[in-house]
Amino acid sequence: MSGKKKESGKFRSVLLIIILPLMFLLIAGGIVLWAAGINVLKPIQDAAAKTPVLKELVPETENKKGAASSKDSSNTAALEKTIKDQKSEISILNKDLETSKSEIDRLNQKIRSLEKTAEDQKKSSEDHTEGSADSKASSENDKVISVYKSMDSGKAAKIIAQLKEQEALKILNGLSKKQLADILAKMTPEQAATYTEKIAASQE
């Protein structure tokens, strides 16, 4: 019992003489270093951060925070570059689209111009064809009339009386007044009266 008391007394003596003053010195030294701007905890934090169990308990150091911040800045810069590239690509596509619309409008205008030219040419061709047909028909009528002009009035009267009324009127209208009178005189009174009325009506 007395041996245990002696050991306990020795431990207290060591605690009071060595450990407590040493702890006081460490605390005082840490305060002085902290006041001088020296981070006395950094070496301890770095050592603890390398220990598998303790690294979860140690807060992030300035280096880690700086690295994380640098990584975030790098990611932000990459995203901004991607956004800028996408906007540039959109701008290029919009310009291409505007160019395509302009080209389409130009082609449509050209097509309309060609269609109008083709329509005008077709109309001109039709007018020319109609004019040629009318000229040809008129020429043929003149030939027929000239035949009846040179024919005997009695014979001409018999033939004209057998023709369709429209054809007969064309021939009679093309004759001179003397030739017309001679031919009508060779027709029956009924025929002469009918053709006289038709000729008078056509000349009104």
Curated annotation (Swiss-Prot):
GO annotation, biological process: bacterial-type flagellum organization
Origin: domain of life: Bacteria
Stored Pfam families: MgtE_N
SUPFAM superfamilies linked to this entry: MgtE N-terminal domain-like
Keywords from the UniProt entry: Bacterial flagellum biogenesis
Region (Disordered): 115-140
Name of the protein in its database record: FlaA locus 22.9 kDa protein
Chain's gene name: ylxF
